[in-house]
A protein has these predicted regions:
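Flexible, substrate/cofactor-facing loop regions flanked by secondary structure
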Residues: 59-132
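Hydrophobic helix-cap positions at the C-terminus of alpha-helices
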Residues: 7-8, 101-104, 159-160
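Acyl-donor-binding surface of acyltransferase catalytic domains
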Residues: 2-72, 82-85
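A generic local structural motif
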Residues: 33, 96-99, 153-155
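Short loop segments at secondary-structure junctions
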Residues: 50-53, 116-117, 142
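Short, high-confidence coil segments that cap the C-terminus of an alpha-helix
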Residues: 12-13, 162-164
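Conserved acetyl-CoA binding element of GNAT-fold acetyltransferases
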Residues: 20, 130-141
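Conserved acetyl-CoA-binding loop-helix of GNAT-fold acetyltransferases
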Residues: 1-5, 136-141, 145-162
């Protein structure tokens, strides 16, 4: 956490954390509170039946799934989320981000969408009983509005149904 804080402060940005309750390590909320962080915004949660998601794929996208975030997944997500202050590969900050994503207590799947050999979008699904939490959904700007995120959601819907 110290490395992440130093990284953002060094880049002139305030460190902030988004916590998805069921996918976060159980000790994270208490650690953030001890370090002086406070909750300042809540997020909306949208729900849909998994069956409604599963049929919305765009055929031209190739979906790959993995139990951990691979290099292409990480590249898409960190580029969209961190842009010009993206953590350098192999740094403590990058390792911390990867470690956080790898630690949910529920079954997790990571997906990427590629077209014409170019990986353009990434997402994460966390199976929670009858629920599938979707987070870290990211599409590179020049590939937006082409069906990549919709196809990722469809793939995650199928995977969520399979994991029930």
């Amino acid at each position: 956490m110290e490395a992440a804080e130093a990284f953002y402060v060094g880049g002139g940005q305030p460190p902030r954390f988004q916590v998805f309750e069921r996918a976060a390590p159980v000790e994270l909320r208490a650690l953030l509170k001890r370090r002086g962080y406070r909750e300042d915004a809540r997020m909306d949660v949208q729900t849909a039946p998994l069956t409604g998601l599963a049929g919305r794929a765009a055929a031209e996208w190739v979906i790959e799934e993995a139990p951990i975030p691979g290099d292409r997944w990480w590249s898409i997500y960190s580029t969209v989320e961190h842009g010009s202050i993206r953590p350098a590969e192999g740094t403590d900050v990058e390792t911390a981000f990867r470690g956080t994503l790898l630690r949910p207590s529920d079954p997790t799947i990571f997906v990427t969408a590629s077209r014409d050999g170019v990986t353009a979008a990434a997402g994460q699904g966390v199976a929670q009983g009858e629920w599938l939490g979707v987070q870290c959904l990211a599409t590179l700007p020049k590939h937006r509005r082409l069906g990549a995120a919709r196809t990722l959601m469809a793939a995650l819907g199928h995977l969520g149904q399979d994991r029930r």
